Amino acid sequence: MSKAYEQSGVNIHAGYEAVERMSSHVKRTMRKEVIGGLGGFGATFDLSQLNMTAPVLVSGTDGVGTKLKLAIDYGKHDSIGIDAVAMCVNDILTTGAEPLYFLDYIATNKVVPEVIEQIVKGISDACVETNTALIGGETAEMGEMYHEGEYDVAGFAVGAVEKDDYVDGSEVKEGQVVIGLASSGIHSNGYSLVRKLINESGIDLASNFDNRPFIDVFLEPTKLYVKPVLALKKEVSIKAMNHITGGGFYENIPRALPAGYAARIDTTSFPTPKIFDWLQQQGNIDTNEMYNIFNMGIGYTVIVDEKDVSRALKILAEQNVEAYQIGHIVKNESTAIELLGV
């Protein structure tokens, strides 16, 4: 490496070490459809091996938001990668797509190989769990763009679904049932508010909350719904799905409903994790607003015919997912969501 480049703030050797450290984690994620190895200019994936008649590709990209600030401040980098994958694959899953491959982007003030390895390990762990190949990525050292120790993580996922099996909400009808799949906690949305409330409260994040350190509760990774939902889709006709992310119930559930229909949700039908009670009390936040910011304990929803509810709940239980019948579909021309009990 030239001295001029090093003096400009770019350490190529640290980048090489980071790649070497992450390679074993990346290799764990490979699928048989991946062509070639690491280091190429473009990553390749053989769709013909999927044995699909008319595959539709579904893509999604997302980041982790300011949850990163907590991870950086407390030096806990191993679960943020899980969040990055979950935010992308859970989104494309709502179409019925099986995630195929993932690419990551990490930008940082300075490449610290040990930190990059922890981030990529988390990404790889999530990719292994969802059978998604981590086929490419970029690590950019940009000292003038970020403060010391800071980094950003984003991801891009591609999946595929048979054209005839594509889930778009067009079959939603009155009387169908909304099933909610439990979240693991806050997931990756609302953290600008969360961090504000943490700062205002003055709490010690190493202290315990509900038998766990506060910091572990706040950094609990976003739940991955791919395996249980794909297992459910094989057995039950799913009419629509939603990933409950930014905007909570109010912004996300209507996205999968056709005009003239609403989801009537009974908020007493599922448990709300205690951390949401803490946030609401700390910020004196109206309950309706809480449902417009956070997932409130439900990270993903599926809509099925009433006759399929018992079978759906049984399948999800077999997949070790807590799920609840949280509402049903009604006709409504004025709003797409009705929340009862708030």
Curated annotation (Swiss-Prot):
Locations listed in the record: Cytoplasm
Claim: Phosphoprotein is one of the keywords in the record: no
Associated pathway: Purine metabolism; IMP biosynthesis via de novo pathway; 5-amino-1-(5-phospho-D-ribosyl)imidazole from N(2)-formyl-N(1)-(5-phospho-D-ribosyl)glycinamide: step 2/2
CDD domains found in the cross-reference section: PurM (cd02196)
UniProt keyword annotations, A-Z: ATP-binding, Cytoplasm, Ligase, Nucleotide-binding, Purine biosynthesis
EC number annotated for this UniProt entry: 6.3.3.1
Gene Ontology terms describing biological process: 'de novo' IMP biosynthetic process; adenine biosynthetic process; purine nucleotide biosynthetic process
Reactions accelerated catalytically: 2-formamido-N(1)-(5-O-phospho-beta-D-ribosyl)acetamidine + ATP = 5-amino-1-(5-phospho-beta-D-ribosyl)imidazole + ADP + phosphate + H(+)
GO MF annotations in UniProt: ATP binding; phosphoribosylamine-glycine ligase activity; phosphoribosylformylglycinamidine cyclo-ligase activity
Family: Belongs to the AIR synthase family.
PANTHER family per UniProt: TRIFUNCTIONAL PURINE BIOSYNTHETIC PROTEIN ADENOSINE-3 (PTHR10520:SF12), TRIFUNCTIONAL PURINE BIOSYNTHETIC PROTEIN ADENOSINE-3-RELATED (PTHR10520)
Protein name: Phosphoribosylformylglycinamidine cyclo-ligase
Species for this entry: Staphylococcus aureus (strain NCTC 8325 / PS 47)
Gene: purM
